[in-house]
Structures are given as structure tokens and as C-alpha cells.
Amino acid sequence: MASLIDIKQRITSTRKTSQITKAMQMVSAAKLGRAESNARSYEPYVSKIKDVVTHVASTGNSNDHPMLVSRPVHRTGYIVLTSDTGLAGSYNSSVIKEVFQEINKKHTSSDEYAIITVGRSARDFFKARQMNVVLEVQGITDHPIFAEIKDIASNTVQMFEDGVYDEVFIYYNHHINSISSELRKEQLLPLTEFHEKGKEADVDLTTYEFEPSEQEILEVLLPQYVESLIFGALLDAKAAEHAARMTAMRSATDNASDLISDLSLQYNRARQAAITQEITEIVGGAAALE
């Protein structure tokens, strides 16, 4: 059995750790509230620009834009959203595992894919395995602004337009609530949903006159729309990250409390045993003197 001093030291260190995890839980809870607000406030913008793109692309005169039409796939781009730090449960590992398995199943050569990482966790994982990471960004703040990922977003769109990629997917954790999230895989490019809508004969849309032409409008709108999807996914993922870290720290705090209770019980038992032993020795010594 451990000595009283050892048990007391473990109780002290566990209590200090519990105070740290409790503080981290409270910080994550505060960050989560703001992250949820950011994600919600951005949704109307994405929805509106999607409506505009739908109207323009569904006119029948411009739905053959290169960003709308599927083409033979020779190279796939993967955007992977993770965090720079850990202590967030399975937040990072679930996304990384899904992308890793998808690449191994779908591709036989590094020439067939390219990985774009947001967050140090994904970058370190894929680079450690000599996988093809072509773009990366770290240091995303807890409450991101578009400027932080503008280069990656615009480069992704440009490389698709230049034929470097034939399709682009984004992987991230979608925030549901404070205790749950789900892994999402979404196709960013090509935007085939708009191309298919343009082919539908029963599309009921208000008639608009476009100035300049639909094609010129799409040249500006489509890249902006894809970039908005990437930023929207980042805001969503950040909310999921803070929720995951809050949950992980709450679990750590609860586990620390349970451990302190167990150690306190051990301490009391050891102390009781020591006292009993001392009494026994005193009684035995007194009896020997009689």
C-alpha cells in the first residue's frame, strides 16, 4: 500500500490538475458562445449568395461554366480543417482518419491527389507520412476572419479553374450542439448542383435582366461563393472545436474529482490502519511491561 505522504501528494497534484481543466472548460464555454454566434450570423450571407448563383446559373445561358460542369477526374483536392492544438477529444482524429482512409482507398499515387490543411494537427499527420500537402495554414484565431484563409480559398478556386484539380472536397466537424458534432464531407468543386438545376425544365424562377452578362457575373460570383463555403465551414468547425474541448475538459474535471474521492478513501484507510497499528503496538508494549 502506498504511504500516506505519497497518497497526499497525488491528491494535491490531482486537485491542481482539476483546477486547470475546470478553468479550460470555462474558457472554452465562453469561446463556444461567440463561435456559435459567428457561425449563425454568417449563414444568411451564404444562403443569399447561393440564391443569386442559382438564379444566374439556371437561366440556361450560362450553366456550362467550367466551375459548374463535371469533367474526367485525374486529380482530387482535399481541404482538411483541424485545430492547432489538442485536448479536444476526437475532434482532430476523426477528420484525419476519414481523409487518410479515403486517400488510401481511392488513390494509388501521390500525383492523383493534393491535401490542403488548415490547422497544425492535419499538417503534422500527413507530412509525417510523406503525403502530398501542397498548401497549409496555421495560427487560425479562435474567432476567424476571412483574411486568415483568403489565400488558401482563392488558390483552391484558381487551381481548379487552371485544371490542377478536377474535383475538390472539404472535410470538417459540423457543430450540432455543445455535446455533439458530426463529420462532414462536402464537394466544393465542381458545383454540379447548379448545373443540374439549370437543366430542369420545371424550374420556377423570377425573370431577371442581367447587366453585364450572366457569364461575366458568374465569373465573379462563383469563386466568391466557393470561398464563402470554405469560410463558413471554418466557422462551423471552430464552434465544433470549442464544444469538443469544453466537453473533454469537463470529462477530465469529472475524472479528476472521482480520482480525488478514491485517493481520499485510500488515504483515510491508510491513516486508519496506521493508527490501529500504533494502538496495537502501544497495547502490546504495555502488556509486555506487566
Swiss-Prot record:
Subcellular location: Cell membrane
GO MF entries: ATP binding; proton-transporting ATP synthase activity, rotational mechanism
GO CC annotations, alphabetized: plasma membrane; proton-transporting ATP synthase complex
Location (main, coarse): membrane
CDD domains, sorted: F1-ATPase_gamma
GO biological process: proton motive force-driven plasma membrane ATP synthesis
Sequence intervals crossing the membrane: none
PROSITE patterns, A to Z: ATPASE_GAMMA
Membrane topology of the entry: Peripheral membrane protein
Keyword entries, A-Z: ATP synthesis, Cell membrane, CF(1), Hydrogen ion transport, Ion transport, Membrane, Transport
Family: Belongs to the ATPase gamma chain family.
Function: Produces ATP from ADP in the presence of a proton gradient across the membrane. The gamma chain is believed to be important in regulating ATPase activity and the flow of protons through the CF(0) complex.
Record NCBIfam families: ATPsyn_F1gamma, PRK05621.2-1
Subunit structure: F-type ATPases have 2 components, CF(1) - the catalytic core - and CF(0) - the membrane proton channel. CF(1) has five subunits: alpha(3), beta(3), gamma(1), delta(1), epsilon(1). CF(0) has three main subunits: a, b and c.
Protein name (record): ATP synthase gamma chain
Gene transcribed to yield this protein: atpG
